[in-house]
Amino acid sequence: FLPFLASLLTKVL
């Protein structure tokens, strides 16, 4: 799981 993906998820949520 990439940290960059986590940032996108947080942005969407």
UniProtKB/Swiss-Prot annotation:
Its main location: secreted. The modification Leucine amide is found at L13. Expressed by the skin glands. It is found in: Secreted. Keywords: Amidation, Amphibian defense peptide, Antibiotic, Antimicrobial, Secreted. GO terms for cellular component: extracellular region. Disulfide bonds: none annotated. This is Temporin-1Cc. It comes from Lithobates clamitans. The lineage of its organism: Eukaryota, Metazoa, Chordata, Craniata, Vertebrata.
